[in-house]
Amino acid sequence: MKRFVLPGVAASVVVAVSLGTAGSASAQSAFQCEPGETYIMNVMVSGHPYWVPVYQGFKQAAEAMGCETVFSGTPDYDITKQIASFEQDLVKAPAGILLHPMQSDPFIEPINRAIENGVEIVTFAADSPKSNRTAYITSDNVAEATFAAEEIVAQVGESGQYAVLENPGQSNHDLRVTALIDYMEANYPDMELVGRQATNQDSNAAYRATASILQANPELDALWIPEAGSAEGAVAAVLEADADVLIMHADVTPTTLEHIKAGNIHMALNPNQGMQGFMGFMTAFLAAHPDMIDPFNDYQISGYNPMQIPFIDNGFAVITQENADAFDLNAYMEGRDPS
């Protein structure tokens, strides 16, 4: 399996882990939770399979340190309902929350208020960069888009037509789309963007949008989708039209995995979900225990949390027919606690 991660970030993580190991004999107790110390993972569309490996990684780190965890959020794709679930989490007074904000700006005030009241917030997979969140864990969305653009050109040539589906308002999805378009314009000007429609992770909307794009552009060569829900509908439309369109998307679901195995989807770029959850917990724990570090900066004067980590790249995997079996969620969950 191919993995992609920023060298600088990878090195810093390795150094951090090495230092933690070296000092474990003398400071082991510092990496343990107090009885009842709880961390929450909050998401939208809580039934989506993407969260399963993330929460497993979150729990693995927590269990190693004697901490308690809760999986929370809303089953709906609704920013108001997610914020309401976040507010309910705050009432429980957890030590920290690993948050996937559906939209960036609506979460600024709730995040800042949570931190002011002593609950540390780390974001993952999507961000609220204007908030005071302590850390952000994600795959490099620009690297994903660049990889996708180069793969599309490698398969269809430097001259052709492509389209994108999108999910406006979610930071990681926005970046996956805009970065690919910008890269194509800068490096492959003969690749023409002929369709761009918002489908908002809705497979039915994606089916209709893709059918419309195909009808208007029968010579379409490739389709890039920033998430897996829309890919489910898009591939159905392409198959129904019997069109020869190369499909690439980010993330993966059991449905799109089967289409990859069947050759209907060329490949998927999937964030390293387990590492996302594991590092998400670690950064939330460290944010809640800032006394564990005395860095060489002005944190004592400025008053900010010294555990600030603006960005950690958890890397991404390329899923193809050859390695698709390794991403079978049912196989992964065998023997694991799903709660």
Where are these regions (language model features)?
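Hinge/cleft segment of the Venus flytrap/periplasmic-binding protein
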Residues: Q28-E37, N172, M184-N187, T283-S339
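Hydrophobic alpha-helical segments within soluble ligand-binding/sensing domains
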Residues: C33, Q82, I137-Y162, L175, ...
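Short, solvent-exposed amphipathic alpha-helices that sit
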Residues: Y50-M65, E144-A148, N172-M191, A205, ...
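Short beta-strand elements in bilobed, periplasmic/extracellular small-molecule ligand-binding domains
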Residues: E63-P75, Q161-E166, M184-S203
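Beta-alpha junction/loop-to-helix N-cap segments that form part of ligand/metal-binding clefts
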Residues: D76-P129, A135-D140, A228-V235
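Hydrophobic alpha-helical
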Residues: G96-E116, L180, T199-H259
